[in-house]
Amino acid sequence: MKTIAFDFDGVIHKYRDGWKDGSIYDEIDESMILNIRYLLKNNYNVFIMSTRDPDQIKQYLDRYLRIYEFNTEKRLFNVEVFPNSQKFWNKQGILGVCSHKAVFDVLVDDRAITYNGNSKDVIEQIINFKTYQKDLIDYSNFSKETFNSNQLRLPFKYQNCK
């Protein structure tokens, strides 16, 4: 079965203001949690790989999972930190968390470029790279009147999102 690694900041933790003071300050992306649950239920090995302290991530996830369980009476999954000496994560049904590069088949990351074997494309991709957050609309410069007017139009790619 495949092993799937997830980055934490920008993928699971929304991370809208960057690193800041190192705290985990933002909301969890609930759709990614449900994706992880789906993978775990379907016998994929899944772990989070981050430069953050894995205990910090585990505490954040445990707090969210307790709230979810209280509100829905459903347990999503358990979370376990694994040590730097462990290179493989293969505990079925449990989300692993580590701060080192462990072995994986697929990586889900908001700051990665897929290498397609053509080294000539890499430099251009690096120079032009933007995270998905950079494509989101910045509403900070809009006035209240703008939000209430008919002038506000979403870019085409967002028009059919619900």
What is the predicted function of each stretch?
Residues M1-K162:
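HAD-like aspartate-dependent phosphatase fold
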